[in-house]
Structures are given as C-alpha cells and as structure tokens.
Curated annotation (Swiss-Prot):
Function: Involved in the binding of tRNA to the ribosomes.
HAMAP family: Ribosomal_uS10
Alphabetized UniProt keyword annotations: Ribonucleoprotein, Ribosomal protein
Subunit structure: Part of the 30S ribosomal subunit.
SUPFAM superfamilies hit by this protein: Ribosomal protein S10 (SSF54999)
PROSITE patterns in the cross-refs: RIBOSOMAL_S10 (PS00361)
Family to which the UniProt record says this protein belongs: Belongs to the universal ribosomal protein uS10 family.
Source organism of this protein record: Pelagibacter ubique (strain HTCC1062)
GO BP terms, alphabetized: translation
Pfam family of the protein (one): Ribosomal_S10
GO molecular function, a single term: tRNA binding
Lineage, uppermost ranks: Bacteria, Pseudomonadati, Pseudomonadota, Alphaproteobacteria, Candidatus Pelagibacterales
Protein known as: Small ribosomal subunit protein uS10
C-alpha cells in the first residue's frame, strides 16, 4: 500500500499569528503519534504599491505601501486516523489561510 502524506500550507500577513498556528498544529500532530517534517519557512511575498502624495502636482513626492505574505509548510508523514480527526477539530486564528493536500 502506498504511503499517505498530508501537506499543510499556511499563509498569513502577521508572522506572529502564523508561528502560533504552526506551533499549535505541530503539537497536535505530535500528540497523536504521527511523524512530522517542518515547519519549513517559505519565501515571504512582498507586494509594493507606489501612490502619489498630492492630488494635482508634485510627481516627485510619492508614498510607498507594502503587504507581506508569510508562508509555512508542514508535512505529516503516515498520519493516523486520530491525527486527521484532531486536525479537523483544530480551531486556528482567523488571519491564517490553511491549504491541505493529501
């Protein structure tokens, strides 16, 4: 039978919330007895926006804004049924986007 792995990708704008969520997932998986790889930090995506400060003139005066999207990757190797059930019951912070692939 083929080994079944679960890959969890987490994304958030705030890295503190993201680290807390990954720690919660890692503790839950370790408690159920499955082996885990990670959390692996993926490259942070930085989007910059440049806007004119004044409404009419002064092209030289501009303001820059940026959004940073932090990412983490967790691999669960050979998950037990208790692991899957515990992950489904897990309640994470609202600012974290979770993507799960089996």
């Amino acid at each position: 039978m083929e080994k079944q792995n679960i890959r969890i990708k987490l994304r958030a704008y705030d890295n503190k919330i993201l680290d807390a969520s990954t720690e919660e997932i890692v503790n839950t998986v370790k408690r159920t007895g499955a082996t885990i790889k990670g959390p692996i930090p993926l490259p942070t995506r930085i989007e910059r926006y440049t806007v004119l400060k004044g409404p009419h003139i002064d092209k030289k005066s501009r303001e820059q804004f940026e959004t940073r999207t932090h990412k983490r990757l967790i691999d669960i190797i050979e998950p037990t049924p208790q692991t899957v059930e515990a992950l489904m019951k897990l309640d994470l912070a609202s600012g974290v986007d979770v993507e799960i692939k089996i």
